[in-house]
């Protein structure tokens, strides 16, 4: 025993020290395995036999579970042959781009034992990309005066391949005027240059078309082409020419600034840029430049300022036209000024009401406007209007006076300021006009409620958060100004109790930050919802509401709790009995535990911490089932002890321990000496149980007396003499219908029959049939024929007769434990779940005697049986219906002894079959219940 424990300790130390020793000796670490494949391999193509290269046997592959571990799995492992297969498209250009070396690194994992191997797959490039130019056609313009030897760089072709498969050379089709040279950028990319070999002549060839080809180094090589279109441009050898040498024009003095006067035009026989002409004033005084403007591109001449006949009656303008080659032409323009209406009206604003409230009604007077014109007659008549705004109009109040009024609703949030252009025009021909801009500021009123950025909010908060921590922030905006736009936040409603909400959360009135007032507990409160309000400071104040849902996340803050085995008064576990002839895999007992947490934190696992005989028992990792791992040996002790740890799935995990005491015995008589040696103190709850039994008995007696008193008062208050007929000698009845009471206050209505025999002192109170639904009241008569007639109208047509009342159905066996659930020596040997317990008459009588003895000894604390009063140191074994097949759930670990939730075998009674147990056993069970 000591030698085996020493070897186990040495193995544990080696498992701990092995990773550190391997890190000290890098040569001992696994070597990376490299493969080389071309890109674009078909799916399921074999890269290599990974199992063979790793030194793994094909027979061990199912147990080792060799697989690929990578973020994107381009490869997979055949579980049968161990071949490394291609599982996805491998495009070298997409994965590695232009890198010269493309390597896919990934890990492979093997279990039992767990090993990680490092694999590198070198992806070789194939010539799967054609060189391509950015443009299918390249347009160039070259002047005919360009000197030979001039170079013209061209855009390079693009080839996604690398190495020999990438772009290698360019070539140009045969021609007389151009040659091709290859250049290289600092980063190594090749690009072509076009070289002019001979001088160009536009009159001989105005257009040249070439074909440029890019070729890669693949086998076979691939190529791409583009067309080069060269247009020969002309040289500047012709000057501009005006259509006229002298231009004459007449202007009225009242023409406004910007008025079109004349457009001069010059032509050039050259082409392209050499034919572009610019116009400018030539040798003119500053007065001409002050009153006239010349467009240098179009030759348009416009007035620059108001003309006045009294200042100058004519102007002479000299214009020069010049091309890019400095070849020029000149002309002159004679401008004569005619006297006319040259006084524009004036606009004067006398008063302006600003700022203007945005809730001003239509027709509100804003300003008074006065107009004035120094001309007379029709030229002095002025018309005034507002330009470009439909919300304001001018109303004439008297001659030359106008009122500016509103003509629509205003909204400061839409337009906070208006720039109104008021124009006055006289009646001259052509008319003159002037304008003035009136700026109106719109003042704010509280006409907008706050608006939240989201329609609803949801936040996740982990439980056990620090009190005072911020868990969310809401934000609402109000387009109003000043106090009307200042928003404050508050909590107005919640699905919690009104007094509890302030103890859970609060909100900052200024920032909208929601704070936790206490630490949340996921087990008590998983989610709650708040209604938050944003309210501005306007008068009257406007508000808006939004919902905030808080989800409390679970943390691993609850340790597992062991439900079985239950601890005795001294804290020790109960005993379980195991047959000596138990085969390996025999279900001994089951450790049942629960965890108050949820999700992964409630996944429980069971582990053996200590065993008096290692290797004798095995423990289910997820089920908690304790089974025999081997048969009981001659040297194994009859009493065994297991220390079991229950851990949850949290990080870090929490755990609880339970101690199992197991006794190998074939009968109850063999267990008694072991149990008698282990005298336990009396149960501290025995006195409390005694008081509860006494209280229950008193309540039952009081209830029974109340029922008798109610029946007596009912009979005494009855005014009908025939209600006493049933108590006369013989059963008599009264003609006419009586009322059969329908007792339906519970979940199922019952029918009752109370009859008093004429020559007997017994009263039979028979529970008849359970009616599936409420039935109408029937007549109560005492003769047999009438009674049978009334009962035939009962629920669902259930027959009711005297022989039916006397016949009793066999007891339902659903209450019995299955063979796997019974304590004692039954174990799992008998597969009949309907068998009775105990198995023989001797065990039954012995067990009844022990129950009576332990019950009497529990009252004075002298019980010698382990496990507390009435337990006899034995515990019910849990059957295989608790086997955890899928993800563990703590609800599957809970079993309530005596509950019919896990008892099956109700089909035997439905089919009319008698239970498997004998009549003798049924009677003994009835005795136990009475005792």
From Swiss-Prot:
<protein>
    <recommendedName>
        <fullName>Protocadherin gamma-B2</fullName>
    </recommendedName>
</protein>
<feature type="region of interest" description="Disordered">
    <location>
        <begin position="901"/>
        <end position="931"/>
    </location>
</feature>
<feature type="compositionally biased region" description="Basic residues">
    <location>
        <begin position="921"/>
        <end position="931"/>
    </location>
</feature>
<keyword id="KW-0677">Repeat</keyword>
<feature type="signal peptide">
    <location>
        <begin position="1"/>
        <end position="30"/>
    </location>
</feature>
<keyword id="KW-0106">Calcium</keyword>
<feature type="domain" description="Cadherin 4">
    <location>
        <begin position="348"/>
        <end position="452"/>
    </location>
</feature>
<dbReference type="InterPro" id="IPR013164">
    <property type="entry name" value="Cadherin_N"/>
</dbReference>
<dbReference type="InterPro" id="IPR002126">
    <property type="entry name" value="Cadherin-like_dom"/>
</dbReference>
<feature type="domain" description="Cadherin 6">
    <location>
        <begin position="570"/>
        <end position="675"/>
    </location>
</feature>
<keyword id="KW-0472">Membrane</keyword>
<keyword id="KW-0812">Transmembrane</keyword>
<dbReference type="InterPro" id="IPR020894">
    <property type="entry name" value="Cadherin_CS"/>
</dbReference>
<keyword id="KW-0325">Glycoprotein</keyword>
<dbReference type="InterPro" id="IPR031904">
    <property type="entry name" value="Cadherin_CBD"/>
</dbReference>
<feature type="domain" description="Cadherin 1">
    <location>
        <begin position="31"/>
        <end position="133"/>
    </location>
</feature>
<feature type="domain" description="Cadherin 3">
    <location>
        <begin position="243"/>
        <end position="347"/>
    </location>
</feature>
<feature type="domain" description="Cadherin 5">
    <location>
        <begin position="453"/>
        <end position="562"/>
    </location>
</feature>
<dbReference type="GO" id="GO:0007156">
    <property type="term" value="P:homophilic cell adhesion via plasma membrane adhesion molecules"/>
</dbReference>
<dbReference type="GO" id="GO:0005886">
    <property type="term" value="C:plasma membrane"/>
</dbReference>
<keyword id="KW-1133">Transmembrane helix</keyword>
<dbReference type="InterPro" id="IPR050174">
    <property type="entry name" value="Protocadherin/Cadherin-CA"/>
</dbReference>
<feature type="glycosylation site" description="N-linked (GlcNAc...) asparagine">
    <location>
        <position position="545"/>
    </location>
</feature>
<dbReference type="GO" id="GO:0007155">
    <property type="term" value="P:cell adhesion"/>
</dbReference>
<feature type="domain" description="Cadherin 2">
    <location>
        <begin position="134"/>
        <end position="242"/>
    </location>
</feature>
<dbReference type="GO" id="GO:0005509">
    <property type="term" value="F:calcium ion binding"/>
</dbReference>
<dbReference type="Pfam" id="PF08266">
    <property type="entry name" value="Cadherin_2"/>
</dbReference>
<keyword id="KW-1003">Cell membrane</keyword>
<keyword id="KW-0732">Signal</keyword>
<dbReference type="Pfam" id="PF00028">
    <property type="entry name" value="Cadherin"/>
</dbReference>
<feature type="region of interest" description="Disordered">
    <location>
        <begin position="814"/>
        <end position="840"/>
    </location>
</feature>
<dbReference type="Pfam" id="PF15974">
    <property type="entry name" value="Cadherin_tail"/>
</dbReference>
<keyword id="KW-0130">Cell adhesion</keyword>
<dbReference type="InterPro" id="IPR032455">
    <property type="entry name" value="Cadherin_C"/>
</dbReference>
<comment type="function">
    <text>Potential calcium-dependent cell-adhesion protein. May be involved in the establishment and maintenance of specific neuronal connections in the brain.</text>
</comment>
<dbReference type="Pfam" id="PF16492">
    <property type="entry name" value="Cadherin_C_2"/>
</dbReference>
<dbReference type="InterPro" id="IPR015919">
    <property type="entry name" value="Cadherin-like_sf"/>
</dbReference>
<feature type="compositionally biased region" description="Polar residues">
    <location>
        <begin position="815"/>
        <end position="840"/>
    </location>
</feature>
<feature type="glycosylation site" description="N-linked (GlcNAc...) asparagine">
    <location>
        <position position="419"/>
    </location>
</feature>
<feature type="topological domain" description="Cytoplasmic">
    <location>
        <begin position="713"/>
        <end position="931"/>
    </location>
</feature>
<feature type="transmembrane region" description="Helical">
    <location>
        <begin position="692"/>
        <end position="712"/>
    </location>
</feature>
<dbReference type="GO" id="GO:0007399">
    <property type="term" value="P:nervous system development"/>
</dbReference>
